[in-house]
Structure formats: C-alpha cells, structure tokens
C-alpha cells in the first residue's frame, strides 16, 4: 500500500471517526509525510494505529493520541510550544504547521541526531531541537504557552510545569496505580489545575520515580 493511501486511511479511519474534525488540525497532519521521518527499516509502519517504537524509551505516539492531545490544547499560531520527546521529528513537524515556534527536546542521542537530520531534510525553519535530559532541562530558560509530552509520565511533571507561562497548558498521559489517563494541566498563579480527560496508554517517556539513564 502506498504511503499516501496509508495517510488517507489514518485520517479517515483513525482520526475523523474519533471526533478529530478541526480542519486546521487535519490539514497539519495531511501536510506531513510520516515516512520521511522514519528509518528505512520502519517504513512499513507508517501511519499505523499504534505507537512506533525506535527503542525502549523512544517512539512516535499513535496518531489518534497525538491528535487528541492537540485537539485538547488547541494550538494557536502565536503560541510558543515545547514538545518533549521528538520521535524523529514527525510530531514536531505537525506542530510546526500549527504554530509559529516549536522547541523539541530529546534525550536519546541517536533519535536527537535523526530528528535534526529530518528537520533539515524537510526544510522546517520554525523548529529548535535540543538535546537534554527530560528531568533536568538545564538548557531551557524560556517559558512556553503550551507543552506536549509525547508519552507517559509516572508522576506530575513539576519540572515541566515550571516552564509554563501563567494560564499555559500541559498535556500528557499520566500513569497512576490502577489506570493510565490523558491529563490536562493548567498553570495558575498559585500552582496548577489538573484535569483528567480520558483513558489512554503509551510507553513511559519520563520516569520520575526510578533512576533513569541519559543516552549519550
């Protein structure tokens, strides 16, 4: 099956039937060729209804979950967005079609290098890709309107919430004792508001509880 057919099937059978109907959002997905961001050995997995795993901690979220994230936070053109977990640059590029400025951080050196190569190859100019441990973020001094964590965390992402502007939004999957759900965090003057949205699952991206390796 051709990649263009796979993409059409993804939009018409994964996104639209699940209430992803914002035409700007659909258009952002239509403009990006996922196969351009996959290593050769992963080409046959383009647009599948599942996560595409490069390694234990590096992956591309399944299209529906990423689309749900964007449908919830509603990116606007003037937003400066932080993406955590670049996944080779595919989700980064979808975001780049929706807002003026995207910062993407990646802690796996191989995937960071792949993302840099893919962003340059596809001539995307409104993206900055940074190599950083997700739990430290020492290189980031900016504050953001919105933050997208492309995977699951196992505790409230306090270090990332600190990077939000007041009234900013953070979206992620939070693993709790007996369930895993999409949560929306809204930054307030005194702390943050935490809203459970819906059940969802993905691999762990940020492990706040156990010691975590930083892959140079």
Q: Residue ranges of each PLM-predicted region?
A:
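Class I SAM-dependent transferase core
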Residues: 1-83, 90-94, 98, 111-125, ...
């Amino acid at each position: 099956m051709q990649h263009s057919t796979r993409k059409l099937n993804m939009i018409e059978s994964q996104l639209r039937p699940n209430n992803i109907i914002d035409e700007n959002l659909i258009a952002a997905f239509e403009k990006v060729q996922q196969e351009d961001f996959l290593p050769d050995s992963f080409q046959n997995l383009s647009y599948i209804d599942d996560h595409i795993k490069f390694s234990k901690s590096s992956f591309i979220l399944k299209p529906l979950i990423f689309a749900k994230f964007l449908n919830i936070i509603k990116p606007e053109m003037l937003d400066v967005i932080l993406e955590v977990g670049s996944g080779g640059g595919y989700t980064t590029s979808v975001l780049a079609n929706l807002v003026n400025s995207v910062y993407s951080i990646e802690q796996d050196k191989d995937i960071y290098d792949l993302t840099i190569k893919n962003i340059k190859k596809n001539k995307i100019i409104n993206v900055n890709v940074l190599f950083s441990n997700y739990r430290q973020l020492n290189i980031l001094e900016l504050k953001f309107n919105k933050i997208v964590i492309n995977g699951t965390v196992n505790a409230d992402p306090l270090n990332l919430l600190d990077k939000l502007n007041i009234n900013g939004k953070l979206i992620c999957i939070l693993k709790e004792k007996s369930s895993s759900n999409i949560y929306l965090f809204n930054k307030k003057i005194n702390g943050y508001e935490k809203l459970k949205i819906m059940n969802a699952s993905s691999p762990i991206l940020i492990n706040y509880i156990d010691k975590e390796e930083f892959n140079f």
